[in-house]
Amino acid sequence: MTKKHLTETRFADLALHPKIQQAISSAGFEYCTPIQALSLPVALSNRDVAGQAQTGTGKTLAFLLATFNRLMQNESSEKTESGPRALIMAPTRELAIQIAHDADALIEHCGLKMGVIYGGEGYEGQKEQLAAQPDILVGTTGRLIDFYKQDLFSLKDIEVVVLDEADRMFDLGFIDDIRYLLQKMPDPSKRLNLLFSATLSYRVQELAYEHMNAPTKLEVEPLQKTATRVTEELFYPSKPEKFPLLLTLIEEDWPDKAIVFANTKHGCEKVHGWLVANEHRAGLLTGDVPQKKRLRILEDFAEGKLDFLVATDVAARGLHIPEVTHVYNFDLPDDCEDYVHRIGRTGRAGASGAAISLACEEYVYNLPAIEDYIGHTIPVTKYDGDALLSDLRRPRPIQRRRRHNSGGGKGKPRGRRSGPPRNAS
């Protein structure tokens, strides 16, 4: 979240614990984002929240502040079990890690302990976290249930429960796990329940009313599905021209930090191969990439060691990557909601961004549903096929292994074009 003045609501005017106010002040935050301004007064009065908000709107800080405040206000609560006082559930391990990272300043000032539990990593280090009896536990449902069934922690002392990106948990099939964990906790009336979702669909609302205590439904600009600061652009390439067009647009835009989406793992591998072959610093993020390598790729991308991240929707969902300037939809997504999630990676918290989509003959049929969902047509840009980059290096054939390499070299792409491709007659 940036330090921009996004609403008239100041953190200093909210009923937050003094140590939390110190943490906010030290981080340089003064004004709330819209979702924070709506949800915090409700949550700080110990009322449940079901909030609709995209990633990048400041919702993570909103539920972290509410969680820490509840625990700090009830410091005298005596734990009767070897379990946490708050549980934050996330759909992906990357999101769980990011949530814990975002809580660092609060942990430093408040003195509460946090543990992070997720799959894809060894058990021993996470068991040590549980042995330290954290006040707040962040995790993915599968590993949480695994450790719970081993009696490594209890849920009987839960005072706050957070469901982040609830819609994605449905998409990934985690809803039964969520219900299992919620049923092991105290009654909803005895805890603070916070749910955040990019969409408050019927099934998400059903979950909220089933396991929450009369939640207040909050929506941030529900009719504005795409960010107003994101410039959208659509091209109609033929299949053979998709890679040359993508690489030409990248050279023309020369983005500081960009994410390229493809619909399949193999599609991502091909895009990544073309980028690396033409000397772009790119990382590949699919479900097959081992966890430690995923974290290294994300760290390199965040630190500017990589300029491009090539990803599938499932692999990228829930990631909090700041300062993404461009999103390229190499394929138009099959799910119209994924289009919104993709382009929502840029233009966050007051910044501007660009979303460029390629509608080839294979995926162009997804366009009507996308435009109907977002409520507007995407501006079309014509291009001159003769102006595309020539003499591009073709990637080496992909070797089918259980693990795929990612990364890239430095430098500019080869084969200068004769002129700009955009707005050609």
Swiss-Prot record:
Residues 40-218 form the Helicase ATP-binding domain. PROSITE patterns: DEAD_ATP_HELICASE (PS00039), HELICASE_ATP_BIND_1 (PS51192), HELICASE_CTER (PS51194), Q_MOTIF (PS51195). A motif (Q motif) lies at residues 9-37. It is an enzyme of class 3 (hydrolase). It is found in: Cytoplasm. GO terms for biological process: RNA catabolic process. Gene3D superfamilies: P-loop containing nucleotide triphosphate hydrolases (3.40.50.300). Its EC number is 3.6.4.13. DEAD-box RNA helicase involved in RNA degradation. Has RNA-dependent ATPase activity and unwinds double-stranded RNA. Component of the RNA degradosome, which is a multiprotein complex involved in RNA processing and mRNA degradation. This is ATP-dependent RNA helicase RhlB. It comes from Idiomarina loihiensis (strain ATCC BAA-735 / DSM 15497 / L2-TR). The gene is rhlB.
